[in-house]
Curated annotation (Swiss-Prot):
Function: Catalyzes the cleavage of L-kynurenine (L-Kyn) and L-3-hydroxykynurenine (L-3OHKyn) into anthranilic acid (AA) and 3-hydroxyanthranilic acid (3-OHAA), respectively.
Organism classification: Bacteria, Pseudomonadati, Bacteroidota, Flavobacteriia, Flavobacteriales
Enzyme class: hydrolase
Assembly description: Homodimer.
Chemical reaction(s) catalysed: L-kynurenine + H2O = anthranilate + L-alanine + H(+); 3-hydroxy-L-kynurenine + H2O = 3-hydroxyanthranilate + L-alanine + H(+)
Name this polypeptide is given: Kynureninase
GO molecular function: kynureninase activity; pyridoxal phosphate binding
Length: 425
């Protein structure tokens, strides 16, 4: 399609957008009395209007039923998390038995490491990407130290080539092959938080398995953003947060994927608690643990119902729309944003550099823009004008036009504000 940098053309794209009505299902903050242009769905998604209703429902049941709400609430609490299984499975490309909702992301990665990081003999190394999200770095380092190894020896980082912004798949595969039988685990972020690069998870997973390692993925920036086929790719485990693209609310519950081939392995190590116990016998208070025959066996404590309520509200919208429709809109709106950025760059003779891959198969919703010659003054100007973006050192603005609630006219309007901000210096 031939794009045009005009308001009329942007409105035309909005009129053709099959999921544009969902914009009205979210609450926008306001600046100067106008809805903001919201580019940070990759940090915290907007609040769905139905979220309050779902939370109020739980509050009402708690007030009227108290402890009896576990079994007699409108959506009973003891099995509340089970309402997520099929819907989440469709988002991440899994069987319903392979997904569960519990805890938060780094907590879940630690728990999954109990099962999937089992160093012994010469097989003790973890392969990850350089400059992973800091929480992943801390988690991996602490796990390595816990097992008695030095991070400088046990952690192998995949590096970008000098002068390049993104990782090359062939370099990742080469590193996996080089480490070989010393590798216990490959653990990478499926979408790089800084550049927005999407990794070839299927190919990398196979390469890790070929050397006898487990392969897991941190999908903090992947779930609800990109096409995932975790079962088909034979991924061992994955975890993600729900408050970014999945709009569940600040710090809300994480999701986990555990490949079904591990569900009934009696020898798999795992930290256990009563909510992973056979649900038919859970309240018999038996001394011996009988695991659920699903990913729920990895649950430890009962679910935080008030937290899960807004998550369920959002997830039901995902189920209505479906990932294919979201990805179709995502590709189009990100391409239009990219076009607008290039147009403004030429008009003002600036020197923006989009460090996210240009190939739509290698990126999701996020475009990371390196502002050569610009600084935080421009970022602050955008924020003051109601353009909510995200700053990452050094000099990068991350823009993530979430397809559920961002419009094509937002992209045009952002371009005009950006141009004004540069020219007004």
């Amino acid at each position: 399609m031939q794009f045009e940098n005009t308001r009329e053309f942007a409105k035309k794209l909005d009129n053709e957008d099959k999921i544009s009505k969902y914009r009205d299902e979210f609450i926008f903050p306001k600046v100067n009395g106008k809805d903001v242009i919201y580019f940070v769905g990759n940090s915290l998604g907007l609040q769905p209007k139905t979220a309050r209703k779902y939370v109020d429902e739980v509050m009402k049941d708690w007030a009227e039923l108290a402890v009896e709400g576990h079994f007699y609430a409108e959506k009973s609490w003891w099995d509340y998390h089970e309402r997520f299984s099929e819907k989440l499975a469709r988002v991440v490309g899994a069987n319903p038995s392979e997904v569960t909702v519990m805890n938060t992301l780094t907590v879940n990665l630690h728990l999954l490491m109990v099962s999937f990081y089992r160093p012994s003999g010469k097989r003790y190394k973890i392969i990850c990407e350089e400059k992973a999200f800091p929480s992943d770095q801390y988690m991996i380092s602490s796990q390595v130290r816990f097992h008695g190894y030095e991070p400088s020896d046990a952690i192998v980082e995949i590096m970008k080539r000098e002068g390049e912004n993104n990782f090359r798949t062939e370099d990742i595969l080469k590193k996996i092959e080089e480490v070989g039988e010393e590798c216990a685990l490959v653990l990478i972020g499926g979408v790089n938080y800084y550049t927005g690069q999407v990794f070839d998870m299927e190919t990398i997973t196979k390469a890790g398995h070929d050397i006898g390692a487990f392969v897991g993925w941190d999908l903090a920036h992947g779930a609800g953003n990109i096409e995932l086929k975790l079962s088909e790719w034979n991924v061992d485990f994955a975890a993600w947060c729900s408050y970014k693209y999945m709009n569940s609310g600040p710090g809300n519950a994480s999701g986990c994927f555990i490949n079904k081939k591990y569900h009934n392995k009696k020898d798999i190590p795992r930290f256990e608690g009563w909510w992973g116990h056979n649900k038919e016998r859970r309240f018999l208070m038996e001394p011996e643990f009988q695991p659920e025959p699903t990913a729920d066996a990895w649950q430890i404590s009962n679910a935080p119902i008030l937290a899960l309520a807004p998550y369920l509200a959002s997830l039901e919208m995902f189920d209505e729309v479906g990932m294919p429709a979201l990805i179709e809109k995502r590709n189009k709106i990100v391409a239009y944003l990219e076009f607008v950025l290039h147009e403004i760059d030429e008009e003002v003779d600036s020197s923006f550099e989009i460090i996210t891959p240009a190939d739509q198969n290698e990126r999701g919703t996020q475009l990371s823009v390196f502002l050569h010659g610009e600084g935080k003054e421009l970022f602050r100007y955008l924020m003051d004008q109601g353009v909510i973006t995200d700053w990452r050192e050094p000099n990068v603005i991350r823009l993530a036009p979430a397809p559920f609630y961002c419009s094509f006219e937002d992209m045009y309007e952002f371009g005009q504000i950006l141009k004004k901000g540069i020219l007004s210096k």
